[in-house]
Design a protein with these regions (language model features):
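N-terminal maturation segment of proteins
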Residues: 1-197
């Protein structure tokens, strides 16, 4: 999880953050989410320095995709087992990211008005963010779905030899890259796994 501690600052605006979404947000932003992911990238000496430092910026679909996948992974791993409120928060988070897909597409491809986006259940400040960052809002779910697709592909290809831990290590060791490169890395992961069979 890195050699240095991370700092997570929780927003105290009660109107902005609902209590039931806290655990999901923590998993997204800390462990197994962004903090864990970025700590791996920064400390991975096999990556070129410019990729460790994020010189070319944060590639949203892979980065935010991992964050949303971390929320999913927490639910899948039973981390909400005794916390129905937390599970509700995770489901709300998934649904919110799905609405983002619709609203961003509506604004940029279907010529929606600002009010149509707000009427779809997205706050005005969020809508303004989507207007100036086309494609960023849907990148969370696009990235998560791609990671799940690649995981399923590797699992089917490798069968009993598939290791979820090794798959996660491959993603984290690859770093923050475009999804096409992550797919190529997954194909290489499968090829290496088949040679072991």
């Amino acid at each position: 999880m890195g050699s240095r501690p991370g700092i997570f600052q929780y927003p105290l605006r009660i109107d902005w953050m609902t209590k039931f979404a806290v655990r999901s947000l923590v998993y997204h932003e800390t462990v197994p989410g962004h903090h864990f992911d970025l700590a791996q990238v920064v400390e991975n000496k096999d990556l070129p320095a410019f990729r460790q430092l994020g010189t070319f910026g944060f590639i949203s679909a892979r980065g935010e995709g991992w964050g949303l996948y971390a929320e999913h992974l927490a639910a899948e791993s039973g981390w909400y087992e005794d916390d129905l409120e937390g599970l509700l928060g995770e489901l709300w988070s998934e649904e919110f990211r799905a609405r983002r897909l619709v609203v961003d597409t509506g604004l940029h491809a279907k010529h929606w008005t600002r009010q149509q986006a707000i009427d779809y259940g997205i706050e005005a400040s969020e809508v303004e963010r989507y207007v100036v960052l086309p494609g960023q809002a849907p990148s969370y779910m696009v990235g998560e779905l791609k990671i799940l697709e690649l995981r399923d592909k590797a699992n089917k290809a490798l069968g009993d030899k598939f290791s979820l831990k090794e798959f996660h290590n491959m993603i984290l060791d690859t770093g923050i890259v475009p999804l096409e490169i992550l797919e190529r890395q997954t194909d290489a992961f499968i090829a290496r796994g088949r040679r072991r069979i």
